[in-house]
Every structure is written in C-alpha cells, then in structure tokens.
UniProtKB/Swiss-Prot annotation:
It is a multi-pass membrane protein. InterPro entries: ST7, TPR-like_helical_dom_sf. This is Protein ST7 homolog. It comes from Caenorhabditis elegans. It comes from the Eukaryota. One of its GO terms (cellular component) is membrane. Belongs to the ST7 family.
Length: 536
C-alpha cells in the first residue's frame, strides 16, 4: 500500500510538471517571471495577504491532522510496538496481533474412495490438495502407529503405506500387510477409506476392523482397559485410539445411510470418554446428527456441555470455540424468532424488537465476527465445493466444512435464512471499514488447503491496486480537462461539441444496426400481456 501511494504521488508531481511545461506559452509564465522582480512583488503585498496565508496554512494543517488521526485510528495495532519498549512488551504485542493458523482435522471428513474419488471421476477435478492429504497421512501415523511397533512386520509395512503419496500404492501396501496378518486393523481402515467405492462397502470393512481390534484388546493379560488419559501401555493406547476412530467412522456410515438413531447412539457412547472424544472432535458429529432429527433441546445441552457457548448471555463472555458451535448456537436462537421477525431489510436502526429478537441478532453478529465466510455459502451466494479434510478456524476452509453439512438445517427452519440475510447485509459495510479485523495470513494458509480451481472467499474485500490507479487517472484527466477548458474556452467548447457529435453518431449507428436484426414492434410485443384464449 505504501509503495502504491508513493507511486501515485510521484505520478501526480510528474503530471503537474508536464502540464506546466505544456502551458508555459499560453500562461506566459516566463514573461511574468522576467517582468516582475522579487522586490516589487513582496513590496506590493498587503496585510490581508498575510492574514489569508495564515488562515490557509492553519486550515491545511488541520486537515492534515484530521487525516493523520483517521489513519492511525484505522491502522492501530499493525506495527509491533514502540522501539523503546522491552522485548517482553514486543512479544506480548506479537501474540495479540498474529492470528492462530493452526490446522484442525475436519471431524466430518468424507470417505476418499466412496465420495471424494466419485467427485473426481465425474468432474475430472481434484477435490483435495496434496498438502491436505499429507496432513491426513501425518494424522494417521500419529493415531495408528507407536514406537513399540518395531519388529512387527505388518505395522512396519503400514508405516510405509501411510507415507505413500499415490492412492494405488497405499492400497497395494495395505494388501501386503493383510497378507501377513489378515486381522491388521490399520490395513482394513485404509482399504475402507481409499478402496471401497460405496459407503456400505466401507462399513463392512470397518466392522471387520472393529472385530479385529476388539479381539486384540481382549487378548491382553489385563482385561480392564486403562483410560486414555492414564499412563499405560503405548500399544494399548494406540489400539484404544484405533477402536474409537473405527467406531466414529461406523457411526458416520450409519448417519450417511439414514440410520440416525444408531448414529446418535454411537456418537453418545464415544463422547463419554472426554479425552478421546475431544481428540477426534466427536461432539461436532453428535451435534449435527441431533440437528438432523430436530432434537434442539439436546443440541442446546451439548453446546453448554462442550463449549459453554450457547448458555444464556454466554456470547458476551468469550469467543466461541469453532464456527460449528457459534452458528449452531445462533441457529437455535434464530429458530425462536425467525417466523415472526418484523425487521425491514433496509433499516439500519431496528426499533421495537423483543429481547429474543435482539438476542438472535447478537448471536448471528457474534458468529459472523468469528467466521464471516459462512453466510455467503448458507445463502448460496457462493458456489460450494466438497469440504477439505483439514481446515483453519475463521477461514474459508472452516466455512466450507460447516456449510456443506449444515445448510439443510438452516433451510429447514422457516425464516432462518431470511433473518441471516438481513443481518449479513447490515454486517458487511460495518466490518469492511475495519481492515484489521481479519488477517490476510489465513487467506494465504487456506490456499494450500483448498483446490486451485476454487474461488477463495476473501473478507473484507480490499480495493485492488489496478482500480485505485484507474480512479487516479480518471481524476487527473478531469483536472487536466478543467484547466484546458479554463485556458482555452473556445477551443475546448469546439472539442466538446465534436466529441458529443461523434457520440451521438455512434449511438444512432448502434440503434440502426440493432433495428436491422430485430423487428420494430419487439418492445411493445414484449411489454404486452398474452390474452388467454377461451376454451369452446
């Protein structure tokens, strides 16, 4: 931005110099300088001139002061801090200004073979990026592998399988591990994710993997399985994690096939173990399944239990944990008032609202402040793509991960999307004034998680440098035309009349060309009403 403004100032100075040089003859600048000496010029100045000069300089100084105050008010917090401050102060400032760019696993991630690969075959477009798939490979290694696997051939092979870049190579490596141990749960999970062409086939492989891992857990000498949070055997912890992962994917298969009660029961059973459910974000799956069966009271209890967000006036206490929590809480508040909302779309000040309506509007605003990329997808103002396997909180990737699964819940409630649209239209101009509310670091990080053919959501939209330069050139052209019109009124008037004549001729030629292709009565024909013919 600083470079563009410097360029514009230099361009302005250069254009003024060129303009003065071009008008040196008509303005008689050289003759005026030769005829009037500096001494006679200053002797002819009156006290009124000095008063006017003082007033003008004071006015200009005041304008500069106002613009400086406006600039520093809007750009406060960009710089790290004063140079005189201590290192501690600088580190505190940096932690406040730098946003969190941690990548989170999408708990609602689809099956690669049954869903992502079908999309790729139909559209010839890659739904996932290599960076996203590499993060998934790292997740699988941390969940399904441990240091005690050394010397066990099938698990050593699976370590190689998770690192393979191509899907076919991963499948072949997993088959090699199954050839050594037909009950290798990790290999069965990989085949369910990447080879099964339908959700039903993936469910069958996952059930087989669940039987294998439960048999392994029952074979331990100590039948009572230690909790994940306690210090215990690393292999047993790994097997417990695999068991939880498989149960979660089985519940997701039941959800996708319409067995909602079975899915909710599976998610509830998993949520009892706080450590594992938090690690895998099972609460998001449970909330979405409860929304599908319209168990809104259970959803409210889940929001209070897992996040504290959704309790009365909790939005005033702290930030929500995720877009799913914030927008689900807003949806529950909107549900109570959406049908009877009395606010006009173009009114900026809403009068006579009930406390429930004010609470719903505040909850929506709070959710939009956390992630403003969600409303365009819910309102279908932007085209939606398949969600990535990982997302960044407050980014476009999180908005896709939420809207892909929750848009039907908003459509089910009459008036919810209308109220969301009203609040969104009122929210955009207010937040667009604050350019520092959302960092551009999230946008650059989201580019690695989303496919290149996807048009990434940017909020707030900044004015491009090309548009700024175009506006500057238009202003300069108007200034030059005004100066020329003042200095050469006769010639300028003739030029303007010639330009107007050319414009009118172009318009008449265009109308004549169009009339040759279209009939003369096309406008009355389009404006006329079709008269229905009565049946005899």
């Amino acid at each position: 931005m600083a470079c563009s403004w410097t360029f514009l100032w230099l361009l302005w100075i250069a254009l003024v110099a060129v303009l003065l040089f071009a008008l040196r003859g008509p303005l008689k600048i050289s003759e005026s300088l030769e005829s009037v000496t500096a001494t006679s010029y200053f002797n002819n100045l009156t006290p009124k001139f000095y008063v006017a000069l003082t007033g003008t300089s004071s006015l200009v100084s005041g304008i500069i002061l106002i613009f400086e105050w406006w600039y520093f008010k809007n750009n406060a917090g960009i710089d790290a801090g004063d140079e005189e401050g201590s290192d501690n102060d600088e580190s505190i400032e940096n932690t406040k200004t730098v946003p969190e760019c941690k990548v989170w696993r999408n708990p609602m991630a689809l099956f690669r073979a049954a869903e992502y690969n079908r999309f790729r075959k139909e559209t010839n477009s890659e739904p996932l990026t290599y960076y996203d798939m590499n993060l998934s490979a790292q997740d699988h290694q941390s969940l399904f592998m441990c240091d005690e696997d050394q010397g066990r051939a099938e698990y050593e092979i699976m370590q190689v399988a998770w690192r393979e870049r191509e899907s076919e190579e991963r499948i072949q490596t997993a088959r090699a591990a199954l050839a050594i141990n037909p009950e290798c749960a990790s290999a069965l999970v990989l085949l369910a994710e990447e080879e099964s062409e339908t959700v039903s086939q993936a469910e069958n492989l996952l059930r087989r993997a669940l039987r294998a891992i439960e048999s392994t857990l029952n074979s331990y000498s100590n039948n009572q399985i230690a909790s994940y949070a306690q210090n215990g055997d690393a292999v047993r912890k790994r097997d417990l994690t695999i068991q939880t992962y498989i149960k979660r994917r089985l519940a997701m298969c039941a959800r996708k096939q319409g067995r909602l009660r079975e899915a909710i029961k599976g998610f509830r059973d998993l949520s009892r173990d706080q450590s594992l459910s938090t690690l895998l974000s099972v609460q998001d799956n449970l909330i979405e399944a409860c929304l599908e069966v319209q168990a809104y009271a259970d959803v409210q209890n889940l929001l209070v239990r897992y996040d504290g967000y959704g309790a009365p006036c909790s939005y005033e206490l702290r930030e929500p944990r995720s877009a799913a929590m914030s927008y689900t809480s807003a949806l529950l508040k909107v549900r109570a008032v959406a049908e009877n909302f009395r606010c006009a779309a173009d009114s900026s000040i809403r009068r006579g609202l009930s406390s429930a309506e004010q609470t719903a509007i505040e909850a929506l605003t709070r959710a939009m402040e956390f992630n403003p990329h969600v409303p365009p997808y819910l309102l279908e103002l932007r085209s939606m793509i398949m969600p990535p396997e990982h997302f960044l909180k407050r980014g476009d990737s999180e908005a896709l991960a939420y809207a892909f699964f929750h848009i039907q819940h908003w459509k089910r409630i009459d008036g919810a999307l209308q109220l969301l649209s009203i609040v969104w239209k009122d929210f955009v101009p207010k937040v667009s004034k604050d350019k520092n509310a959302f960092s551009s670091q999230l946008e650059s990080a989201d580019k690695e998680l989303l496919p290149s053919w996807h048009e990434q959501s940017v909020f707030p939209k900044t004015e491009g440098t090309l548009m700024m330069l175009l506006q500057t050139f238009i202003c300069l052209a108007i200034c030059i035309l005004a100066v020329l019109a003042q200095q050469f009124p006769a010639s300028s008037g003739e030029i303007f009349r010639t330009a107007a004549t050319i414009g009118m001729q172009f318009y008449e030629n265009s109308v004549y060309t169009v009339s040759q292709w279209a009939p003369g009565n096309i406008i009355p024909y389009l404006a006329s009403k079709q008269v229905p013919v009565p049946e005899l």
